[in-house]
């Protein structure tokens, strides 16, 4: 009897060990992130932000000159040209059309600091952190200067087709000049700003700039922060942004959690900050995106990927698509 009991206990122990090992092996975060975010599990609000900081801090950034080569991984359109964040009429060739002399939109592309480098005194690693240093048309970038992002009232300058704009801010709380990126990248920029507030939690309070408040937890002016939260909701994470985030991980070894976990900003600063974060069982926030069926026969409209490639609508894989100019989610 004793031997049987011992064997039974042993089997139970082995089963328990295998169960625990199985949990450890199979618990995975989104976008092939594995257990990258595991140390943030169970955290809330400010503690969650600090946990994310400890995970993504100290990126192994490339040199400033090395960004040009790195853009071939992070910012290449399906047709092989550079993805330009400020203009949609350019066809820049990687390396060939890089920063140089320019007189007009479409001449060259260069490296744009979404958070102007003058705000952090051109210090490293922020200066070449590819999460926020993106390729843009050189002329349009120059017009942006170091103005904060915002929503323009009276337009003083706009790129071709009004893709990007510059002028006095129309948002309550600020009347200075702002640069307004296109609607299709406003969410991307918002999530970059959330990343910068998190990855550089130990530094950002010491930065200058009209929207920097000198605080660690939520470092942006109220009007700016509220706008960024709205931008992130109105322009949700898409497959282009996810692909870029994965490429960034290959380049500098860290990720943007606000891309991997859509709506994470609400868990850090917003209405869900009292809720515990779960890295492998996350309640994805798809506010702003309507659902669409996988099967659509016959197809009533032209449906494309976020890159503009038309797809067969008879069986859509899970993801985000564009239908009649609006984003839809297939679960």
Where are the language model's segments positioned?
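C-terminal tail/sorting-segment detector
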Residues: 9-10, 320-331
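Domain-level detector of nuclease and nuclease-like folds
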Residues: 101-110, 114-285
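N-terminal module-boundary/linker segments of secreted carbohydrate-active enzymes
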Residues: 26-92, 267-275
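Residue-level detector of functionally pivotal "anchor" positions at catalytic/ligand-binding pockets or at interdomain
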Residues: 277-309
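Bacterial N-terminal signal peptides that target proteins for export
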Residues: 2-14
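C-terminal trimerization/auto-chaperone modules of long, extracellular attachment fibers and adhesins
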Residues: 311-313
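N-terminal signal peptide c-region/cleavage motif recognized by signal peptidases
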Residues: 22-24
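Short, His- and charge-rich active-site/binding loops that engage polyanionic ligands
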Residues: 88-108
